[in-house]
């Protein structure tokens, strides 16, 4: 495929929606090129390997039977799912001066699931369906210009690519970094900065262990807390149940602490609940997602949950050549992996 071919479709953003869209269009024999500003694919899906090889999720993790498009895609790609472990006693902390409460979570008829091997298996498998030369990492789009019968896409490295259609598969708040010529209509350009970006305010942590001592002691690993740095935590053992750990979220105030202070506060809170065995961890990592969403050199503004799936995000622009896709644009399950896939399918259906 010639990169200057005006029949080429350019997808801006190599997250789940962009990769799913490229995969769906490849089945229609449509030429696509993915431009990703980051040095990695996946967007808000990021699985790392711990020191013992444990797949640890710093981004999107869970889904359910209510997400049929994701389930169908996993089946189509030959990927396995498994239920989130929840057997045993769980902790609930109300106030710091009150003892924690223990409770049991009943086995759910519709449990949360995870992807065997880590959520990035989905990203990696989709990427393998696309020729490597048509995935450009560390390529930030700076401008999109409409010319006769095509769009010209300029990148930060000075490259200019031509396309018959361009799909913006990135959070709407980040679209304002792109210069459009002619400018987008005022109604859509005023909406874009107000759309909430999912996970932009999240801080996620993972801990890796040699053995699941909490399970051996009758605990699920689940924690809900109104005190301490960790408001929410879950068992994070792998599909084969031979690698073990925890994953959870840190409260918003943790963003002002150093990594070492965050780790110390996490371990202090958890040791009060699980005992000294919590200190025998193999690795600790956390991810401040606000660091991923940089707009004009600053972190994006945290928005309330608003304007996801807005009607103006469903329309096309620049003479039916420019489209929006992504989980924020989905009219269903916005913020979930399911929403990203639904949005991609809706765009693919227009080709």
Predicted regions and their residues:
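Core beta-strand elements of the Rossmann-like FAD/NAD(P) dinucleotide-binding domain
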Residues: 5-7, 156-165
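A conserved short coil-to-beta-strand element within the FAD-binding core of flavoproteins
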Residues: 137-151
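Glycine-rich FAD pyrophosphate-binding loop
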Residues: 26-51
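A short alpha-helix-loop-beta-strand transition element characteristic
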Residues: 55, 70-91, 213-219
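Flavin (primarily FAD) binding-site architecture
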Residues: 168-187
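Conserved flavin/dinucleotide-binding core of flavoenzymes
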Residues: 8, 20, 102, 150, ...
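N-terminal Rossmann-like FAD-binding beta1-loop-alpha1 element of flavoenzymes
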Residues: 7-34
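Short beta-strand to alpha-helix junction loop
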Residues: 61-68, 107-127, 260
């Amino acid at each position: 495929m010639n990169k200057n071919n005006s029949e080429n479709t350019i997808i801006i953003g190599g997250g789940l929606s962009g990769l799913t869209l490229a995969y769906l269009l490849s089945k229609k024999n449509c030429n696509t090129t993915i431009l990703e500003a980051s040095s990695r694919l996946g967007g808000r899906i990021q699985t790392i390997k711990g020191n013992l090889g444990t797949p640890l999720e710093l981004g999107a993790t869970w889904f359910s039977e209510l997400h049929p498009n994701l389930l169908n895609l996993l089946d189509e790609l030959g990927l396995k799912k498994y239920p989130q472990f929840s057997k045993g006693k769980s902790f609930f902390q109300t106030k710091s001066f009150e003892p924690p409460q223990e409770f049991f979570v009943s086995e759910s008829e519709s449990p949360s699931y995870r992807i065997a091997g880590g959520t990035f298996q989905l990203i990696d498998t989709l990427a393998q369906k696309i020729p490597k030369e048509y995935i450009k990492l560390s390529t930030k789009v700076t401008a999109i210009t409409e010319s006769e019968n095509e769009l010209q896409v300029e990148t930060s490295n000075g490259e200019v690519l031509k396309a018959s259609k361009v799909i913006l598969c990135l959070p709407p708040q980040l679209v304002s970094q792109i210069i459009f010529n002619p400018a987008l209509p005022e109604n859509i350009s005023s909406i874009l900065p107000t759309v909430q970006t999912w996970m932009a305010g999240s801080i996620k942590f993972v801990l890796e262990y040699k053995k699941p001592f909490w399970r051996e002691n009758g605990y699920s690993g689940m924690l809900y807390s109104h005190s301490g740095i960790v408001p929410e935590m879950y068992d994070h053992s792998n599909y084969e149940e031979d690698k073990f750990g925890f994953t959870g979220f840190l409260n918003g105030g943790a963003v002002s602490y150093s990594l070492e202070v965050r780790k110390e506060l996490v371990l202090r809170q958890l040791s009060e609940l699980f005992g000294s065995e919590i200190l025998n961890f193999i690795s600790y990592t956390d991810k401040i997602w606000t660091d991923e969403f940089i707009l004009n050199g600053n972190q994006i503004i945290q928005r309330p949950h608003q304007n996801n799936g807005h009607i103006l995000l469903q329309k096309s622009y620049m003479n039916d050549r420019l489209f929006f896709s992504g989980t924020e644009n989905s009219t269903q399950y916005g913020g979930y992996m399911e929403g990203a896939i639904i949005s991609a399918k809706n765009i693919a259906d227009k080709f």
